[in-house]
Regions:
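The feature marks the mature, well-folded catalytic cores of soluble enzymes
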Residues: 1-201
Length: 201
């Protein structure tokens, strides 16, 4: 647990820290979105799924980041919520869900040999077992030049609700896409219901 001095910026902003706890753990990078736990509910109780993290396909050092969730749990940061290690590499930014069993993701990331080495059927089975997905929407477009994540879905398309997907139909020149785009038609081609909405932003 970190001392009050480490919370100086929040104190200066007059934030109420009465219910805040700060923990210091060694890390390689800042992307808690990708290496942090994913929470699921079982029998009405939360469970922290601690997937493996390998620095986006071993592009960067990752050993410390891969241990952060376990170290925080050992420090009591999550209270009584149980932690369950999952022997599968998965980043938080690589998956998008409507909360009703549908997964939206990219083949370029999740099926990349530098992650798990599983084929589509094998990965769908594992994700169904661990996260409860029953419907899988795979985008094959969307590679961004200079993107170290191998096309995380959270930069391409997001669920607004269970009937609405938001995506950018054409990327600006400042963020070039190497010959491929996440277009409205590519989302529709996944078989997403024609009664649903595809919003272009």
């Amino acid at each position: 647990q970190v001392g009050v001095a480490d919370a100086a910026p929040m104190l200066a902003a007059d934030a109420d820290l009465s219910r805040c706890r700060l923990y210091a753990v060694p890390s390689n990078d800042i992307w808690a979105r990708d290496h942090g736990p994913i929470t699921v509910h079982r029998d009405g109780q939360p469970v922290l799924l601690d997937f493996r993290f390998n620095g986006w396909g071993e592009k960067y050092a990752f050993e410390l980041d891969d241990r952060i969730t376990a170290r925080l749990h050992e420090s009591g940061a999550f209270g009584p919520t149980p932690r369950e290690p999952v022997d599968l590499i998965l980043e938080g930014g690589s998956i998008e869900t409507d909360g009703r069993g549908t997964l939206l993701t990219t083949a370029e990331c999740l099926l990349n040999p530098n992650r798990n080495g599983l084929d589509r059927a094998g990965l769908e089975r594992r994700l169904g077992e661990t996260l409860g997905f029953t419907r899988f929407l795979w985008l094959r477009q969307g590679h961004l030049a200079g993107d170290d994540t191998d096309s995380h879905i959270d930069t391409l398309a997001r669920f607004c609700d269970s009937r609405t997907i938001t995506c950018e139909p054409k990327r600006r020149s400042a963020t070039p896409v190497s010959g491929k785009r996440c277009t409205i038609s590519s989302v529709i081609s996944l078989g997403y219901s024609t009664t649903s909405k595809i919003l272009a932003i």
